[in-house]
A protein has these predicted regions:
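Bacterial Sec-dependent signal peptides at the C-terminal "C-region" and cleavage site
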Residues: 4-18
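Extracellular and select intracellular beta-sandwich modules with Ser/Thr-enriched
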Residues: 457-464
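Short, solvent-exposed loop/turn segments at the edges of extracellular beta-sandwich modules
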Residues: 451-457
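Short beta-strand edge segments in extracellular beta-sheet folds
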Residues: 465-469
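N-terminal acidic, glycine/proline-rich low-complexity segments
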Residues: 14-390, 396-418, 430, 438-441
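Short beta-strand segments within Ig-like beta-sandwich modules, predominantly Fibronectin type-III
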Residues: 422-427
Length: 469
């Protein structure tokens, strides 16, 4: 047997045939937990989802808690990767994975369900920009991180690169500046269109300067490249996520802390919990959203394109009403399931066994269906105005044989037809939807939400978009 076949034999058939993961780069101001614990909290949680996300890089950078970034703080990121190096052998049991790919193969394209080696993640941790503000962008500010972003964009890979800014986004700003200096306008445009950035507020400055938006490189990116760089500036989801973490802290104490090596380094409560987590929950391939459409409500919030919190630039955001209340409403709805999902993964980290999420399969014979049935991406169904549409999720299953509970609901904010539609028997495995006669030319977003009956009552979703003709 060839070396490659021997390696592939260690992967389950499901993983070998799975779709590719979403690509993610994290910019973190991780540091001393006595100063700010939430980056460490979010980093632990991120590691428990390494089978769902292709971690292209984790870069240290400035944030509200520091400028410049202290070099000695990199040890806290190393601590997280060291803990992952212990727990990954239990975590990979979740995918029936017996071995790792070669490092060369890991550096290629990873599929959903694959747990990367700790060596791979260590090789992808590096320094980003360690000084804040637009004033430092330019010559002398290149870093391993900004150079690596350019390298990632140049790879032969059609998948977008999501940048989750837990601190400042200035490492991306520096990469953009460098490409602007060295490439043509069309090449710069192509570079920008490879990236999407989700920022947890604007942290390209220390906390005391947080209202001085002109200081930040974020404003430069928003003003200069608004037509080509998809930018989500979150000011509605992370604050509530922090507060809900306080409300649910006892569950963190019982079912996260102390579970596995990752749980043993999960910080003790100081103040708000995991403020940065929504940025990577946003790209979670759980069937609830297509990250390319920020109006779709998911674990990372719900956003509308409009005026930013600097009252000058425009991006996808949720800081103003009514979207602020809308995204908060969805976050309150999803949070218990989000936390249960994390806790279940920490059980795997500790014990190498536990519950797995159900698999949602939705079919319909009522219209022309587009999309992969077993993909986490939404499916589209072309339907006629005034018709009845039958959606059937009875072929959904649970890896552990658990009973499944169904709930179908409409998300009007993502739909171009914003009025309620009639969903008959919304708690059955199959439903009939009456398409209104005045919905011609519109879209209607329906979500099939499925819980199992096992520990933590894990959830999975499927979004169905009815394209009304």
């Amino acid at each position: 047997m060839s070396a490659m076949l021997m390696v592939m034999a260690g992967l389950s058939a499901k993983t070998k045939n799975a779709e590719l993961k979403p690509r993610l780069v994290v910019l973190t101001d991780i540091g001393d937990c006595d100063v700010e614990p939430d980056d460490m909290e979010s980093a632990v949680r991120l590691m428990s989802y390494a089978d769902c996300i292709e971690l292209e890089a984790i870069m240290t950078t400035v944030g509200w808690n520091c400028d410049p970034y202290p070099e000695e703080w990199t040890k806290f990121l190393d601590k997280v990767v060291d803990a992952y190096s212990i727990d990954v052998y239990n975590l990979r049991q979740r995918s029936s994975q017996k071995s790792f790919l070669s490092l060369k193969e890991e550096n290629g394209k990873q599929r959903l369900g694959y747990w990367p080696s700790a060596e791979y993640i260590r090789n992808r941790t590096m320094a980003g920009s360690h000084r804040a503000g637009i004033g430092v962008i330019g010559e002398g500010n290149d870093s391993d991180g900004s150079d690596f972003l350019i390298r990632l964009a140049d790879e032969d890979d059609d998948r977008p690169i999501w940048v989750a800014a837990w601190g400042g986004g200035n490492t991306l700003a520096q990469a953009i500046w460098r490409v602007k200096q060295t490439r043509t306008a069309e090449e710069l445009k192509a570079f920008l269109r490879k990236f999407r950035i989700y920022t947890i507020t604007d942290q390209d400055m220390v906390y005391a300067m947080r209202m001085n938006r002109a200081y930040s490189s974020h404003r430069w990116m928003l003003q200069e490249f608004k037509d080509d760089l998809k930018f989500i500036w979150d000011e509605g989801t992370w604050q509530l996520h922090v507060g809900l973490g306080v409300d649910y802290w006892q569950q963190y104490e019982r079912q996260v802390q102390g579970h596995g090596a990752l749980g043993r380094i999960y910080p003790k409560y100081k103040y708000g919990v995991e403020g940065d987590t929504p940025s990577f929950l946003y790209v979670m391939p759980n069937g609830l959203t297509d990250p390319e459409d920020p109006s779709q409500a998911g674990w990372g919030g719900c956003h509308v394109f409009g005026l930013c919190a600097d009252s000058l630039t425009h991006a996808w955001t949720s800081w103003q009403e009514p979207m602020k209340s809308i995204t908060e409403g969805y976050k309150r709805r999803f949070y218990p399931d989000e936390l249960n999902d994390f806790c279940a993964r920490m059980q795997w980290a500790s014990e190498g066994r536990g519950n797995k999420n159900p698999v949602v399969v939705v079919r319909s014979k009522s219209g022309r269906m587009q999309g992969k049935v077993h993909s986490p991406s939404p499916i589209h169904i072309k339907v006629a105005a005034g018709s009845d549409v039958l959606l059937d999720a009875s072929k959904s299953s649970d890896p552990d044989g658990d009973r499944l509970d169904f709930l179908w609901w409409q998300q009007p904010e993502a739909s171009t037809y914003a009025h309620p539609v009639d969903i008959s028997h919304a708690d059955d495995s199959s439903v009939r939807i009456s398409v209104p006669r005045d919905a011609s030319g519109k879209t209607i977003h329906i979500v099939c939400e499925v819980h199992d009956s096992g520990p933590f009552r894990l959830v999975a979703y499927k979004r169905i978009i009815l394209d009304v003709e």
